[in-house]
C-alpha cells in the first residue's frame, strides 16, 4: 500500500488524514504547529518536524494548506526531496496560477495533481467531500476517493479553477442572503418569516449555508478565495462581497469563525 505524506493538519487536513490511516496507509504527517499532529500519532501516524523528511520516501504527498503563499513556501522545502515516481496532490484552494507555477517547478518523474475539495469540516470527517481533480490523477484517484467522490476536471489547473468558480458562487450566495436578511431587518420583518421564505425559494441552498452549524470556513479564507477570483476576472458583484468579508475578517471575534458568523456581521454593518 502506498506510503503517504500529509502536510497541513488544520480543520480540514486532520480529519482527511484520519481516513488514510483507517484505510491502512503508512502515514507521515507534518504541521507547522507540531502539537496538532499528536492525535494522529496516537492513531498510528509518524510525525516529523521537517517537511522534506516527511516526503522523502513517500509515494504520494498531499498538501492541505492555507493558501498560495503557504504552498509556495512548502514547495521550496519539499521539491528537492520528492523522489521520481511520486505524486504531489495539492488540495488547498490556491487558484490555477499557483498550480501552473508548481507544475513548472516539478522535478523529473514527479506528477502534480491539483485536487481541491468541496465541503467543510463535517464532510471531511464523514468522507463525503467532493474532490475536483485536475491533471493526471489516474495514479491517485483511488486514494482521493477515501475523502469522497472524485470529479476529473481535465488538464492541470482545472481542478483549482473550478474550485474558485464554486467558492465564488457559495460565498456570493451567503453574502446575498445576508443582505436580504439585512433588508428584512430594516423593514421590520420577523427573522423566522424572512428566513423561511428565502429557504423555500431558489436560494434555499445559500440560505442553508448562511445559517449552517457544525462547519468551518473562516472569513479570512473567504477573503483569500474572493481575492483569487477577482484577480482572475472582473467581477464587480464579488468585489462588493469582498468588502463585506474583509470587514468581517478585520474583526478578531469573527475572522476565524465560520462565514455563517459573518452573516450576522454583515446584517449589523452600518457603513454598507
Located regions from the model:
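Rossmann-like NAD(P)(H) cofactor-binding subdomain of soluble oxidoreductases
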Residues: 34, 51-129
Amino acid at each position: 500500500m502506498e506510503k503517504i505524506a500529509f502536510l497541513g493538519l488544520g480543520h480540514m487536513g486532520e480529519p482527511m488524514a484520519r481516513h488514510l490511516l483507517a484505510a491502512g496507509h503508512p502515514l507521515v504527517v507534518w504541521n507547522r504547529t507540531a502539537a496538532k499532529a499528536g492525535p494522529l500519532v496516537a492513531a498510528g501516524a509518524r510525525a516529523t518536524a521537517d517537511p522534506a523528511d516527511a516526503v522523502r520516501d513517500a509515494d504520494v504527498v498531499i498538501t492541505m494548506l492555507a493558501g498560495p503563499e503557504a504552498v509556495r513556501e512548502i514547495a521550496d522545502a519539499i521539491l528537492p526531496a520528492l523522489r521520481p515516481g511520486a505524486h504531489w496532490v495539492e488540495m488547498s484552494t490556491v487558484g490555477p496560477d499557483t498550480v501552473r507555477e508548481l507544475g513548472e517547478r516539478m522535478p523529473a518523474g514527479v506528477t502534480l495533481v491539483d485536487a481541491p475539495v468541496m465541503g467543510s469540516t463535517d464532510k471531511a470527517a464523514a468522507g463525503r467531500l467532493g474532490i475536483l481533480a485536475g491533471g493526471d490523477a489516474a495514479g491517485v484517484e483511488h486514494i482521493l476517493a477515501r475523502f469522497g467522490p472524485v470529479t476529473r476536471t481535465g488538464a492541470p489547473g482545472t481542478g483549482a479553477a473550478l474550485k474558485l468558480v464554486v467558492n465564488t458562487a457559495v460565498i456570493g450566495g451567503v453574502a446575498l442572503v445576508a443582505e436580504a436578511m439585512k433588508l428584512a431587518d430594516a423593514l421590520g420583518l420577523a427573522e423566522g418569516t424572512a428566513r423561511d421564505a428565502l429557504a423555500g425559494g431558489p436560494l434555499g441552498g445559500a440560505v442553508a449555508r448562511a445559517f449552517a452549524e457544525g462547519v468551518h470556513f473562516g472569513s479570512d479564507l473567504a477573503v483569500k478565495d474572493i481575492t483569487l477570483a477577482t484577480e482572475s476576472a472582473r467581477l464587480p458583484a464579488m468585489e462588493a462581497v469582498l468588502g463585506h468579508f474583509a470587514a468581517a475578517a478585520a474583526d478578531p471575534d469573527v475572522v476565524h469563525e465560520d462565514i455563517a458568523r459573518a452573516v450576522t456581521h454583515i446584517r449589523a454593518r452600518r457603513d454598507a
